[in-house]
Amino acid sequence: MYLTIPLEIYLKLNYFLKQFPTTEWSGPAWYKPHYRKGEKFPKGFTLVHFHPVDLGHGTATTIEAGDTARILQKTWKDYPETEKCMMGIIHSHHNMGAFFSGTDKNCLKDNAPIQNFYCSTVVASKKEKFAFAISYQDQYGKTHLIESKSEDINMQMPNKSKEQDK
């Protein structure tokens, strides 16, 4: 299961990580699924958009349903591609490294949909930079959680200029 992070999103992630180096933040995120022809299980996703709605503290952040509801209409208007995406979450672990804690895994399990998939991305400014996972319920109501390997998270990086080397 892969995740692609486009350059524009990568730059936005870095901005928030630099602005809040010791504080966790979170918000809804929209993911475009990618399928092999004729298959219903995605081979990967692209992180299309995210909107931080909560600035937590050093060890936690919380998203309330009302926070997400308030931004949905504007998000769909400003980013029409999000209407065809699956919604999930993104949050930071600032300088602790990106990984799925027990709380993060419970969030994935609690939000596993009966149809489609719930995606979650964790980002960090130190150590492991990205972690990605999905959850879903199968036809028998059993919840599944799939974590991507770090090498399956692809960032579209900016071209390094001579100015950046100085």
Label for each model-derived stretch:
Residues 1-87, 95-166:
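Conserved beta-strand-loop surface patch within small alpha/beta domains used
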